Amino acid sequence: MIIDIGNSRAKVVVMDGDTLVKEYAAEEFSASLFAEIMEAYPAISRAIIASTRGDEEVVKSIVAQRIDRVIIFKPAT
């Protein structure tokens, strides 16, 4: 799972190796969006979070409830 939090919207991509499986887009990344994705793809075990907003720790707190392996890219990265 790749989560890209931009200035105007959040995009989430589900990958299987090098293959893009599904794309999601919303104004905000939320616990309900994450739950929807995890319900559809319960085998997801890794996530990358990138944010230009500086809210990556909030997103991580949602994601870390179900996924242990999380990499974060912050605005300064």
Label every PLM stretch briefly.
Residues 61-77:
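Glycine/small-residue-rich loop that forms an oxyanion/phosphate-binding "nest" at active or ligand-binding sites
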Residues 43-53, 69-73:
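Short glycine-rich phosphate-binding loop at a beta-alpha junction
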Residues 1-21:
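Gly/Thr-rich phosphate-binding beta-strand-loop-beta motif of the actin/hexokinase/Hsp70
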Residues 22, 27, 47-57:
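N-terminal beta-alpha supersecondary unit
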Residues 35-46, 66:
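Phosphate/pyrophosphate-binding loops at sites that engage ATP/ADP/AMP, CoA/4′-phosphopantetheine
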